[in-house]
């Protein structure tokens, strides 16, 4: 048997997971400060949840979704993105009920799955951090969502990101734009890729998202959606841009931005990072927008909504270069080195007491020689080593050594139970 992880998956080992934890803890604290609460949904759903939300003609449904029939004959899919499952939960668990405060604001951190070619920052199992806000059609909801994405990236230490923004208008705007795209692409249909020939029939907007060179040559002269905006949609978009200006959030109006999912309506946006050492062109690390009809699509009441998702793998690649402090090795506060008859029991008691007080503490369960224990303390990046031998146990006095400069102090065994008394002296 070949023991090997599946293609497109990675092991996040202990020396790497600490940086992931820091990013997720920063994001979790950020969302809580914004009055968003965590939601957790299943990693698999009924297939229709994703096919209806993403769109049958989307690349996700056509090529990337992991789906299968389970032992009960149910058509199941692993989630390819986070929004659909949250919307399903919103409807099924009746979060639209009047007694639930609106807007209903949630965030999530979860694994997602897409069958695509693995490359830098893109795996077949990847991690997504996202937010969703249900219940407000006010442009302030769009602005807050964009502002949160902008400020979270800044708080994480991303430096050279740029906001790209566009609007997909209302239903009439999208219908008029749909017809214009059909009229534009139909004369060159035979020159399009096979996928885009099908998209021309099902959803010509998807052609604008094509990466195929046969399609890309026609995109610069394709109609732009803002040519079809009515006054209401135009005013909505301009009010959002004005608020972003007042917040000092720079942006680029990107006519080619359409996002890869069919459920988007109104304003859509992406935060992009350009780093030639990672990717040939600017790459999206956060994307989102408004989706005002998806709750209805899932048989819920008409509910406006807006949100975004972050690809955590891509984010970590950027942060590794731009915020290396996140990737520094973790340290522990205390390592208890013990040697001699009868010291092991006291060592574990001291470790337990320190942990209860909120300190990070460890000891050597293998009872190696003292020199080896000090080496382990150094590898664990311990700040202090407490030495416990037969003499210390007999006298009830411990020696604490600060590894950064070798400073030592003595304290009684009783002091261990309230280290707040001695931490000031240890830090001097």
UniProtKB/Swiss-Prot annotation:
SUPFAM superfamilies: Class II aaRS ABD-related (SSF52954), Class II aaRS and biotin synthetases (SSF55681). Homodimer. GO terms for cellular component: cytoplasm. Gene3D superfamilies: Anticodon-binding domain (3.40.50.800), Bira Bifunctional Protein, Domain 2 (3.30.930.10). It is found in: Cytoplasm. The keyword Magnesium does not apply. NCBIfam families: hisS. Pfam families: HGTP_anticodon, tRNA-synt_His. This is Histidine--tRNA ligase. It catalyses: tRNA(His) + L-histidine + ATP = L-histidyl-tRNA(His) + AMP + diphosphate + H(+). Its EC number is 6.1.1.21. Coiled coil: none annotated. Keywords: Aminoacyl-tRNA synthetase, ATP-binding, Cytoplasm, Ligase, Nucleotide-binding, Protein biosynthesis. GO terms for molecular function: ATP binding; catalytic activity, acting on a protein; histidine-tRNA ligase activity; transferase activity. The keyword Cell division does not apply. Its main location: cytoplasm.
